[in-house]
Amino acid sequence: MKMFESLDSSATKSGRDLWAEICSCLPSPAQEDVSDNAFSDSFMDSHPAGESHTAAADSAVQPAGKPWAPLHDSEVYLASLEKKLRRIKGLNEEVTSKDMLRTLAQAKKECWDRFLQEKLASEFFVDGLDSDERTLEHFKRWLQPDKVAISTEEVQFLIPPESQAEKPEAGDKPAAAEQ
């Protein structure tokens, strides 16, 4: 390890000379005056290993050997960033399968509701076929039983025959009491 040997020497060096010793990459003052302080950096390493100082100064003025070219995947990367930005902003244009199923279920429900609300039988069946209200109600009940009201025939079918027989007998007894 080398320490300061000439600390007590009377010879003083200028700051430029000291920096020139520390960093040999700095241009000399004569070269600074020649270059008219124009910015000409190519952002390339100006001093490759094994190259002298003067050769490096000449390469800074020359254009780089390879022209700039985009990376092969730069377009893909930019597209993915734009997609993430749209998703964050809520502007996602992609339709997911969940969205498709939700839309189809809603459309199906709206079609069935419209069908069940319609009263004209001619819209539902082919012209020339006879269809009465009972057929239409039966068809609606078969498709969506929870949407159609129960008929009087179905109520009679649901009531057990024993309770139907008791009703007329109960009706006859009060009539006999009145006489």
From Swiss-Prot:
Membrane topology: Peripheral membrane protein
Entry keyword Transcription: no
Keywords: Cilium biogenesis/degradation, Coated pit, Coiled coil, Membrane
Pfam families membership: CCDC32
Coiled-coil spans in chain: 75-98
Biological process (GO), any one: cilium organization
Annotated spans, Disordered: 36-65, 158-179
A GO CC term assigned to this protein in UniProt: clathrin-coated pit
Disulphide bridges: none
Domain of life: Eukaryota
Compartment list: Membrane, Coated pit
Quaternary data: Interacts with AP2S1; the interaction is direct and mediates association with adaptor protein complex 2 (AP-2).
PANTHER family: COILED-COIL DOMAIN-CONTAINING PROTEIN 32
Record function comment: Regulates clathrin-mediated endocytsois of cargos such as transferrin probably through the association and modulation of adaptor protein complex 2 (AP-2). Has a role in ciliogenesis. Required for proper cephalic and left/right axis development.
Name of the featured protein: Coiled-coil domain-containing protein 32
Organism from which the protein derives: Mus musculus (Mouse)
